[in-house]
């Protein structure tokens, strides 16, 4: 088996072009390609290019809407809900995190709940975004019981 080494810029470009060619719009492709590149950069290969074929399959099947726009709803001063409209979770987080950060700074604590989105992907880049804003973050996702 031949190993091909790619630079981070090449990974970003490959991921973005692949997503664009398979149904994502520019914004969604850029957000997800950046996350894929960061996963590769940080050594989390299971959330880097490895995920690209599954994203493409979801886009082609219609399970994932690569052009959807999440809807942000403020439930209370410290609870933000984002309806994913079947887009990928990184797109949802891109729209919801600024609202979460604002609410946490105004109220001391805040929660971001998302639904109807697909695959959370790597979650540390989002918690890093919150930490860079001077806050503490805890991220979790639901999944089938494993115990």
List the predicted regions and their residue ranges.
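Alpha/propeptide regions of enzymes that mature by internal proteolysis
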Residues: 37, 90-93, 97-115
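Aromatic/hydrophobic pocket-lining residues that form π-stacking "cages" and hydrophobic walls in ligand
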Residues: 15, 100, 126
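Generic N-terminal amphipathic, Lys/Arg-enriched alpha-helix
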Residues: 1-22
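Glycine-rich anion/phosphate-binding loop at the beta-strand->alpha-helix junction
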Residues: 109-147
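N-terminal and secondary-structure boundary signal
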Residues: 20-23, 42-46
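Active-site cofactor/substrate anionic-group-binding motifs, chiefly glycine-
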Residues: 48-101
């Amino acid at each position: 088996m031949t190993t091909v080494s790619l630079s981070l810029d090449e990974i970003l470009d490959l991921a973005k072009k692949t997503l664009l060619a398979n149904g994502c719009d520019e914004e969604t492709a850029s957000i997800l390609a950046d996350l894929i590149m960061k996963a590769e950069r940080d050594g989390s290969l299971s959330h880097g290019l490895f995920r690209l074929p599954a994203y493409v399959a979801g886009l082609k099947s219609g399970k994932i809407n690569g052009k959807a726009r999440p809807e942000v709803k403020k439930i209370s001063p410290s609870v933000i809900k984002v309806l994913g409209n079947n887009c990928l979770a990184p797109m949802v987080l891109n729209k919801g995190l600024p609202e979460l950060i604002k609410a946490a700074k105004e109220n001391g604590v805040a929660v971001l709940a998302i639904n109807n989105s697909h695959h959370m992907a790597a979650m540390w880049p989002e918690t890093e975004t919150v930490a860079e804003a001077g806050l503490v973050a805890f991220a979790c996702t639901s999944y089938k019981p494993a115990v």
